[in-house]
Amino acid sequence: MASLKDVAKLANVSLMTVSRALNSPQRLKPETLARVQAAIEQMNYVPDLSAKKIRGAHASPKTIGVLALDTVTTPFSVEITLSIEETARAHGWNSFVMNMFTDDNPDAIVDLLLSHRPDGIIYTTMGLRQVPLPAKLLTLPCVLANCESLHHPVASYIPDDEQGQYSAVKALLEAGYRQPLCLHLPEPLLATARRRKGLERACREAGVNPDGLTHRYMALGDEHYRDIPAQVLAHIHAQKPQFDSVICGNDRIAFMVYQTLLAQGLRIPQDVAVVGYDNMVGIGELFLPSLATVQLPHYEIGRLSALHIINGSEHKQTTRVASPFLRRDSMLAAD
């Protein structure tokens, strides 16, 4: 990352002149100010807020800067930032979080993040997605948590959605269910295709044709959870379901399925089994009966991402973190 000294050298001025250009530009001649500003822009220099710390203080602990895209909108992704902080503290590091929203100016947010001079950066998002990575972030050790880079080879830690769904469907089929109704997340989401791939693999291994099952995709937007009951009721005739189980794209879909089935007088799991995905924080075990689901490994993703920075890891591979199936009472046990 460019320093004040680098800017001064390029502009052929003193450090004091660069400092004045940043803090008191009115004190410089216009031509000198223009030369310094051109050097700042050319070198992508970002002012160092940490330079304002008191001189002579003890060396500060190293710091991880977390750039969090849309994570404050959901309780799930908060586990990632919590894990990063706890892991950093356990290793004598500090961390701070800079929230960014989809409609923010990313360059301004990134400059603000870098102005605090972190020793490493973790870029995390709400929901698995591919992100364009601002080039400035790559001037420091950088890792992605719950997202993948669109263009640059950068280490990333993401849920193993395919294996997680495979494990859940395999357990369902081993328990004797053969006609699941599949209610998927919206088709454009990155996790959707990966989970369906795991579902299809489990079905084929059990001798079930996945193309012969009923697949429904939720539309994008939280308001479309209200569409779930109609999708379920379309396959119930005279209170007799045309399916023996429901594979849900997440636990919120499962919640809507529970209400619909119970309102029809159907028993879970005796008449219909239900399997969710996510293991909603503090909620999954409160379903009656408790919901069998897959754990999104957000806490582990945060821990591994922090350790990547702390340990100075240099690999740039994508690491798929295990998403374990949690067997609970919404499905019968295998014979």
PLM segments and residue spans:
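Hydrophobic alpha-helical segments within soluble ligand-binding/sensing domains
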Residues: 155-182, 225-234, 296-314
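Extreme N-terminal segment that seeds HTH/winged-HTH DNA-binding domains in transcriptional regulators
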Residues: 1-15
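N-terminal helix-turn-helix/winged-helix DNA-binding helices
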Residues: 1-2, 41-75
